[in-house]
Amino acid sequence: MVARPADGSPALRIYVASNKKIKPPLEIGDCFLGRVKRVGGNLWAKPFARTSKAGGETEAEKIFGVVERRGNEYYLRPSQKNARLDYLLDDIGKCRDGDFVAAMLIGERKFKQARIFKNYGPFDLNKAVSCLVLDKYGIGCDFPETIGKETARCPKFSKKGRADLTSVPLVTIDGDDSKDFDDAVYAERTASGFNLIVAIADVAFYVRPGSALDREAYRRGNSVYLPNMVVPMLPEKLSNDLCSLKPKVERAAIACFMKIDRSGNLKSYEFKRAVIKSAARLTYREVQDAFDGRFNAQTSGLFTTVIQPLYEAYFALDKARKKRGALELDVPEVKIKIGKDGLIQSVSKAEHFASHSLVEEFMINANVAAARVLAAQNLPVMYRVHEKPLKEKLEEIEPLLRGLHLKLPEQPALKPAHFNRLLEVCAGKGWSAGIGNLILRLQAQARYSPEHLGHFGLGLADYAHFTSPIRRYPDLLIHRALIKAYNMPDGGGLEDNADRSLFEQIGEHISATERQAVCAERETDARFLSAYMQPALGSDFDVKISGLTSAGIFAAVESLGAEGLIPMRTLPDDDYQLRNCGFELFGTRSGRTFMFGDVIRARLTEASPVTGGLIFKYVDEHDGVDYFEKGSRGSFRIVPPGAAPEPEMGKASGRRKAKLKSGKSKK
C-alpha cells in the first residue's frame, strides 16, 4: 500500500507498514496518523491509528493531555476544559508520569482507552502549550527545505517603473514588540482636505503565484501570534527583512494615494508600485505621547511635519466613520509578556490609544479603495465580508429589548447605528457590558469570499483586506489583483487564466485558517493566564459577571483579562432560573439575583495550565459566610412558562437585594 500527504502537497511515495492493532485493517482511501522514516532509499510510514475511513467517516479522535500514574495503571488527563473523563492508557511506551502527550481514542464507545502517538516530554508551560495548540489545529512551525532554497533566490526589486517615495517622510506605527512592519503612512494638508499615502510591503514581488512560497503561504493562510512565539505565514527572511518596511532602508511597496475632504470622505484614490524609505519606526505609545505634548528625541523632530498632520487627517476620517455609523464595540485584549527565561513577566489589559484608531482608519480607507478599484475592473476579488445578523438571532433578544423599552428595526433596514444607540441607552448601567457582549454574539462571523456583500460592522458597501500581506494571504491576493488592474511593472500579478471558480474554495480555506489561528491564540492565552493565576490560589477577587448559564456564573478578573467559572453548586442554596435572555440568574426562594455586569466577590480554587481553566467559588462579603464551606448548594431548574412573572431589567426586585447583601453597587 502507498500513501500520499493528506494536505494535497506534492505527492511523495510513502510505503505503509502493517499494524495489526488497527482493526479492521487500513484500506485504500483511509486516512491515518503515522510516523514516517527513511528505510534504505524508501520512505515508510508506521500507522498508529485510523483518523477516517474512505468516504470521510471519522474513525478516531485526537486528544492531548498529561500522563498520570494511579497505582499500577496510567491514565491520560485531557487538556480540554470540558473533558469529563480521564482515559486509561493501553501502553505508555517510554512515557513517564507527568509527561505531556498526544493520543488517539480507541476501543468501544463506552470503554474508550487512549493510545499515545507523540510525547512532548515533561509538562512545561512554554513548550507544552505551544505544541498543543499548534498540533491541535495543524499549524506547522518549520518551513519545508524547498522554501529556504527559494527564499535564498529571491531577486532584488528594480526601481524602474516604480514611484520614488524615498523623500516622503512615511513612518511605520506599530506595537512595542513588533518585528514585521508591513504598512507606513503619511498625510499632508491641502486646500480642500488631505492627501494620504498608505504604503504596504510589496510581498507579491517576492511571492509569485504557483511558487513553493505561494503554496506554503496559502496552506498557512495567516500568521499566528502566541504570547511566547510567532508562527509566520512567510519565512523570517521575508517577513522580518526583505518585505519589512524598516527605517532608513529602501523597500519595495505598493502605495495607495488617497484624497479626502475635510469631512473625511474618500474622494479619489490610485495605486502604484513604489520605492519607499521609512523615516522612522514609531510605536503607538510614543506617537500618542507626542500628540499629548510628551516628546522624545525621535518624535520631537517629526511632530510638525509628520505626526500632527496624521492626527488632523484622522480626526476628519473619524467624522466620516461616525457619520456612517460603524459599530462601536469595546472588545478588550489581554497582553501577556514572556521573558527571555520563558517565564511570564506580566499580564495586563492591552492599552488602546487614539494612535491605534489613527492607523486603523488609514488602513480601512485603503482597504475600501482597493475593493472599489477591483470591483470596477470586474476582476476576481477576495472580499472581506461581514453580513447582517440573522433574523433568528434578533428574534431571540426581543424580550430583553422590550424590557428596556427598545426595538430594533426589521433586518433589511438594520444598521450598525441601531446597535450603537442600544449601547448609548445602556451606558453607565451595571449590565451595559452584558449588552455589548450580547451585540457581539449576535454578529455574523466575518469571512473571506468572492461575493461582494459588504461589511456590516464597518458600515461599508465595499471592503477587502489590502494592508497586511506579510501576515494574511487574502491581502496578497488583493495585491496581485491590483497589479493586474493597473498593469504594474515587475510582475507578480494575478494570472490571466486565474480560475474564478476556485476563489470560493480559497475563501473557505483562508477563513478556516483564520478561525484556527483565533482559537489557537485564545486557548494559549487561557493556559498562560491559568499559570499566572496559580500563585493566587485561595485569594479573593472582585470579579465581574461575564456570563450566566445553567452550569454557573462566568466571572472575569478584568484587570488581567482572565475568565473563570463559579459553579452552580457553590452558590447559596436556592432554585435558580435564567431570565431576560440569560442576563439574570434569579433565586426563586430568596429573591437573590445575579445580573450580567454585577461585581461580586469570589475565591480562586483551581487554576489549571493544562486545561486553561479557572474555577472560583462564590463568597458573600456581607455576612462573611463562605457558602462552599458551609455546604449549601445552589440548584438550577427550568421554570415552566407562566410559573413566575419575570421582572423587567432595572426593577429593584431581587437585584437590589443581591447588591445589598454583597455590599456592591455599580452606582
Model-derived regions: residue spans:
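A short, charged
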Residues: G107-K110, A114-R115, K149-R153, G293-F315, ...
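Phosphate-interacting basic helix/loop segments used at nucleotide- and nucleic-acid interfaces
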Residues: L165-T172, D176-T190, L310-L327, E523-D542, ...
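Structured C-terminal cores of nucleic-acid metabolism proteins
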Residues: S9-L12, L26, A369, E392, ...
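Feature marking long nucleic-acid-engaging regions of large polymerase/nuclease enzymes
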Residues: Y87-L88, R109, D174, F181-K393, ...
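A short beta-strand motif that forms part of the nucleic acid-binding face
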Residues: P5-S9, S18, P78-N82, G107, ...
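Short coil/turn segments at secondary-structure boundaries
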Residues: C131, E145-K149, A163-T166, S268-K272, ...
